[in-house]
From Swiss-Prot:
It catalyses: prephenate + S-adenosyl-L-methionine = carboxy-S-adenosyl-L-methionine + 3-phenylpyruvate + H2O. GO terms for biological process: tRNA wobble uridine modification. S-adenosyl-L-methionine binds at residues 65, 90-92, 143-144, 158, 225. GO terms for molecular function: carboxyl- or carbamoyltransferase activity; S-adenosyl-L-methionine binding. It comes from Chromohalobacter salexigens (strain ATCC BAA-138 / DSM 3043 / CIP 106854 / NCIMB 13768 / 1H11). Homodimer. Keywords: S-adenosyl-L-methionine, Transferase. InterPro entries: CmoA (IPR005271), Methyltransf_25 (IPR041698), SAM-dependent_MTases_sf (IPR029063). Its EC number is 2.1.3.-. This is Carboxy-S-adenosyl-L-methionine synthase. Catalyzes the conversion of S-adenosyl-L-methionine (SAM) to carboxy-S-adenosyl-L-methionine (Cx-SAM). SUPFAM superfamilies: S-adenosyl-L-methionine-dependent methyltransferases. Gene3D superfamilies: Vaccinia Virus protein VP39.
Amino acid sequence: MTRRVQYRHFLWPRPRLDAIDWLMSDASYRDAIFSTPLDRVANFSFDEKVVACFPDMIRRSVPGYGQILGMLGLIAERHLRFGAHVYDLGCSLGAVTLALAGRLPPDAFTLTGVDLSPTMVARARETLGEECPDHRIDIVEGDIRHVDYRPAGMIVLNFTLQFLPPEDRRAVIERLYAALEPGGVLVLSEKIVLPDEQENAWLVERYHDFKRANGYSDMEISQKRTALENVLVPDTLDAHHERLHEAGFTRVSTWFQYLNFASMVAFKDA
C-alpha cells in the first residue's frame, strides 16, 4: 500500500518557499540583455549573461511562474509516495527543487535535477547546497533526451520541453512515462500557441502588454522574440494532451493557464 504522509506535521529547516524572490536578491541582476539595439540578434541560449539575470527574467517574462512553483510543492505533498525519486528536468537554478524542499522533509524523497547549461548547473548546486543541505539532491549536467532514468514517483518539466526540437518531444514523453512508477505524476509546464490564428495573435499581444507592464521596452520585446524564434517552438494544448495520452497517460488535465503559458498534470495508472 502506498505510504502517504501529512508533511505539515514535520518540522525541519526549510528553504524560503518563494524561491524566485530569494534567488533575485540583488537589483543589479535585472534583465537588460536586449535593452540596447543589436545589429544581429543571435539565437537565445542559457549562457552566463542569462544565468546572471535569470530569476528577474523569469519573474517579468513568465506569467504565473510563482503560482506554478507553489503548487508543485503541494502536488508533490499530495501525490508523491514517501521515499520516491523525483526528476526536475531543465532544472535551471533549482527553483522547482527549492519549492519541493519547502514542502517535503529530507527523508521524503530523493531528487535528480538535470540541465544542459553548465553555468546553470554550477549555480543550482551552490544554491541548493546552501538552502537544502539535508535533502538528498543531485544536480547533473546533461541532455534530458539521453538520461538513463531510474524509476520515479514524480517528474517535472517546467518550461523545458518547448526548447527541444519538435520531432524529439514524443520520444522524451514516452521515456518519462516508462520511468514513472505506477501512480506516478508528470507535471508539464509550457508556453503554448492557440490553433486559431486570430485568437492567438490577441493572446500574444496581451502577453506583450504583460511584459511592458513589467518594465520591458518594445525593443527588448522585439529582440527577445527574434532570439527565441527558432529556439522555443510552442505546441497547442491539444497537441500536448494527445502526446501524453499516446504515451500511455490516461488522466491528463490542464490545471493552470495564464495568457499563453500553461501547466498540465498527467498520471500513470496505479
